[in-house]
Amino acid sequence: MTRRGALGLFVLPFAAIASPSATAKPLRIVCLDDGLAETLLMLGVSPVAIAGRDIWETWVVEPPLPPEIADVGTLLEPNLELLQQLRPDIILSMPYLDGIKPLLERVAPVTTIGLYTEAGQPYQRALEATRQLAGLVGKESEGEALIAATDAYFSEVRRQLAPLSARPIYVVSFMDPRNVRVYGKKSLFQEVFDRIGLANAWTAETNYWGFSTIGIDALATSSDARLAYLEPLPEGAGGTLTESPVWNAMPFVRNRSIMRLPAVHMFGAFPSATRFARVLASAITGEAARG
């Protein structure tokens, strides 16, 4: 695939790379990991069910979830009766759900794929998962196209942002007006930073999922850092922050270097990584245009 061809796969955000085969009987897949589900959709395969449609519509957003996909409830307490009614051929799970694996195996064979591990490297895990899923559903060429398109897109964003990449950036999600999750080592966002040539302002250790939960005062360590925060904000947080002396003393507040990002699935795979690169690049170029 040429670089131009790979980039073309992202002209329309998250357009499906493939259409399901009209001849082969598709596997009936229940997918309990949104990162795996978004990858399947990009391969042109719709699972019969996921867990938590409301979570998808709030945080994952893209690719859109087809309305016919069922919702089996929460991750840790899926509706086993509904699962049985769906008659899946396979259930895709993640290590986080190993505690309920025996229950799931009463319904269908379970395949566990871990995008997030103690070792980190979620980008490499996403690449491996893309190939594993593509092999499972007979979409090997589409899987390689998705990998090539993702790498090519990041190269293009890196070129676009090169003149604007000098200052580091904090990426946070607000837990409440005083505390945030800040994303760093082992996170999907860090992997994207590395590939598009940006510096992360948060260099301290993080947990299994690639974030630290800190008070907002801990964001004052870098005098020239920018802040990118992910929507949605907790109810009432915006008004409380504007009245907070601690918040108003932050260097990025005084320098007016704050960027609002639409929701991105921070625990996703290649589609989430691409969405993050796209919305962050838009915010950075918009900030530069405003001067």
Regions found by a protein language model. Give the residues of each.
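N-terminal export signals
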Residues: 1, 5-23
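Structured C-terminal subdomain patch of bacterial secreted/periplasmic proteins
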Residues: 27, 128, 222, 226-291
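A short, structured surface patch at a secondary-structure boundary
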Residues: 28, 34-86
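Extracytoplasmic substrate-binding proteins
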Residues: 28, 109-175, 202, 266, ...
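Alpha-helical, coiled-coil/dimerization segments enriched in small aliphatic residues
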Residues: 55, 185-210
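Short helix-initiation/N-cap motifs at beta->coil->alpha
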Residues: 72-80, 206-216
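Proline-aspartate-enriched helix->loop->beta-strand connector
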Residues: 87-93, 224-225
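Ligand-binding pocket segment of bilobal, Venus flytrap-like solute-binding proteins
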Residues: 181, 211-232
